[in-house]
Amino acid sequence: MNANVSKLLNEQINKEFYSAYLYLDFANYYAAVGLDGFENWYRVQAQEERDHAMLFYQYLQNNGEDVTFEAIAKPEWERGDHMAPLKKALEHEMLITASINAIYAAVYEVRDFRTMQMLDWFIKEQGEEEKNAADLITKMELFGGDSKGLYMLNSELKARVYTAPSLVL
C-alpha cells in the first residue's frame, strides 16, 4: 500500500473515534436536559462511528499495514439550545465526507483499486449520514418549538436501534 494512503487511513481512524466522542458528548447533553430519545439517537450514532473506525483498522490490518493510534481530542462545540448539537453534527459529517473524498482522490492517484472499492461504501454511507443530520435539523425546526412536537420527535428518536455496518472486509 502506498505510504501516503496508509497515513491517510490511519488519520481517518482517529477522525472516526473523534466522531464517536463527539456524539457521546451530544448524548450526554441531551440526557442532562431530559431528552432521552435524542440521547439514544446519538448513542447509536456513536456506536456507528466506532464501527467505522474499526473497519478502517481492520482494512489496514488485512493489508499488512501498521496501525497508529493518536490521541483523541476532546469534543469542542458551543452548548446553547437543543439545536446546537444537531447543527454541529451536520457540520462535522460534512468534514468527514471531505476527508473521505480526499482519501479517495489520493487512492485514485496511485491506482489502489482495492482501497477505492472499500471506500465506495464509506462514500455512500456519508451521503446517508449527511441526510440524516440535515433531516434532524429540519424536524427540529418544524416541531421543536412546540412541546407536543418535541415530545413526538423525542419519542421517534428513542425508537432507533443499532444496526451493524453492512461492509464486510
Give the location of each predicted region.
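Iron-associated oxidoreductase/ferritin-like identity signal
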Residues: 1-169
